[in-house]
Amino acid sequence: MSESQPPRRGRFPLPLSATTPVVRRFVSTGQAVLQPVPPRPQRPASEITRETARPAILAGHGLDSDGFRARMIERLRADGCRDEHVLRAMSRVPRHLFVDSALAAQAYEDTSLPIGHGQTISKPSVVARMLGLLRQRPGGAQLGRVLEIGTGCGYQAAVLCRLASQVYSIERLKALHDRARENLAPMRRDQLRLIYGDGLHGHGPNAPFDAIIAAAGGHAIPQAWLDQLAVCGRLVAPMHDAQRGTQVLVVVDRMPDGSLVQHRHETVRFVPLESGTSDYKPA
């Protein structure tokens, strides 16, 4: 995901009318073929001192204070985020409980952090941006059934639970699936279902979805995701842009007539979208 950068002018909101849309109508001609994408980690793990992955239980560290989250929210608001529903949801989720204790002091900074297995937790501004875009779907801001591709440590799923009535989150790495389950257990969110599986195929049993959000990017949007998007639904995902030679945020809307319309937004940096599952756990 996008790396830490020097302060810049506000990025929120960025209405679709303010962009130069690339409109495409998709024709279902079979499964989209993904080509290998060079790894694009949000932040090299070597740049950050870390210890063996374990939940950040930080009694006495002071990070349980609401003040830390409040300051994070104020920074997002100052940067231009105007979706108060997203900001309120993020203010209620303790991000430090989803990262390793060695990194907890950085939990409320606007930076991505490693969570092991070559994956990262998204920086708060990226989470706010993508969720804000998700809520601007043609069917309205109220989200019903949402599919998250790439559970990771579970942080974004926890935020989504405060914005949607049903959240399905799928993770291909068993170790991260288990970690997310452990992280989310104390929150007891009845509307959340965690799935261990190949996110490349979406999650057909509970489709269609009002919204689909992905935490990894490939060369094309998988056909399964498009097929599982409800009428008036919206998909937000990173995708490789051949013209720019980098990843961009892509928004795909299923219009009332069933057609699919795509818009491309700013440059981002996400880990690559991969197929299959892995139950590998380090010794």
From Swiss-Prot:
- Catalytic residues (UniProt): S122
* Superkingdom of source: Bacteria
Organism from which the protein derives: Leptothrix cholodnii (strain ATCC 51168 / LMG 8142 / SP-6)
> What's an example GO cellular component term for this entry?
cytoplasm
Ranges that cross the membrane: none
User: Which protein, by its recorded name, is this?
Assistant: Protein-L-isoaspartate O-methyltransferase
Q: Which is a Pfam family this sequence falls into?
A: PCMT
Q: Name one GO molecular function term.
A: protein-L-isoaspartate (D-aspartate) O-methyltransferase activity
Main localization category: cytoplasm
Listed under catalytic activity are: [protein]-L-isoaspartate + S-adenosyl-L-methionine = [protein]-L-isoaspartate alpha-methyl ester + S-adenosyl-L-homocysteine
| Function comment | Catalyzes the methyl esterification of L-isoaspartyl residues in peptides and proteins that result from spontaneous decomposition of normal L-aspartyl and L-asparaginyl residues. It plays a role in the repair and/or degradation of damaged proteins.
Q: What does the record give as EC number?
A: 2.1.1.77
